[in-house]
Amino acid sequence: QLDSAVVFEEPELLAIGKKTIDSWFTQNMDMQLYKRYFYELFRQQKHVLSKEEEAILADVSDMSADVSNIFSMFNNADIRFPSIEGKEGEKIPVSHGRYTLLLESRDVNIRKSAFESVYSQYGQYRNTLAALYAANLKNTAFFAKKRHYNSSLEMALEGGEIPTSVYTNLIDTVHEHMDLMHRYVSLRKKALKAEELH
């Protein structure tokens, strides 16, 4: 409701024009506080729609947030991980908060058990999680298209002023040198005489 109520703000500010708003910064030093906001507003001007279109997107965004909310409830409230057994046979609870600590244990059995505890539970819900992921992709594709972005990736990076080439170059560079990671894992397995690393 709040989004719908203030949806007129950006289109009306853009209608005032950059020249007029820039003059405010010289006339009133208190306006300097908002310089970054207006810079971003005019930089992304082509992605701001009319008041009517913004109102529709505000209503739709409320519904589209459900995908994120459903995953958040599942991940933070509903999913439970089985306890694992410690060195002395004691039960060790597994949670999101403890998982990283358990993976840093010097005991390979604790690391392995913690990994299996978490991922066996997620594995049970893989179809649900895949459906949520697909719905999220459709949401972002919808908003990217309506706001005249070339892709969902471009929309996601726009706020940080990051060109998509930075992202794709990063992925390409990782792929290019993946053989080094494979070699490292292979050497580590050999040194530890292990079939799998945990």
Description of each model-found segment:
Residues 1-198:
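A well-structured
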